[in-house]
Amino acid sequence: MAWDLFLWIVSFFVSLALVASVFYQVICLTDLEADYLNPFETSTRINRLVIPEFILQGSLCLLFLLTWHWVFFLVAVPVTVYHAMLYKERRYLIDVTEVFRGISFEKKLRYTKLGFYVFLFIMVVFRLTLSAVYSFTEDDDLLHLF
């Protein structure tokens, strides 16, 4: 059970990083729309977070697959496949010259991903709490055997 608790702690921090990353991207796009940032700064800030987000999402999905958590894997695999498709088609970076033309689509995409990552974060927090309670109650039961 200790490995299960470790899995959920790692998943907690990875999903928290994903939520923070996408939230930062939404803030950058909102600042661009309000004319607080120029297109170059916005695209630079967002583009440097895209590949780490893809890697974190893919590794989290792979972690769920390798630990046989099928429900979490099936929840996470559509976004992972979408990220792989974007990477394969080379459409994952925001172009400086066309950022204003596609800002509404990019914001909708980021809001959708933010909603998905918040949902995944809530699921992981629930399982982390459940695993911690089970882990600590089993340890207490083992102490009474001696």
Curated annotation (Swiss-Prot):
InterPro entries membership: Cornichon
Keywords: Membrane, Transmembrane, Transmembrane helix
Keyword Transmembrane set for record: yes
Record field: transmembrane: 9-29, 61-81, 114-134
Top-level taxon of the source organism: Eukaryota
Pfam families, per the entry: Cornichon
Protein's cellular compartments: Membrane
Membrane topology type: Multi-pass membrane protein
Recorded family membership: Belongs to the cornichon family.
Protein name: Protein cornichon homolog 1
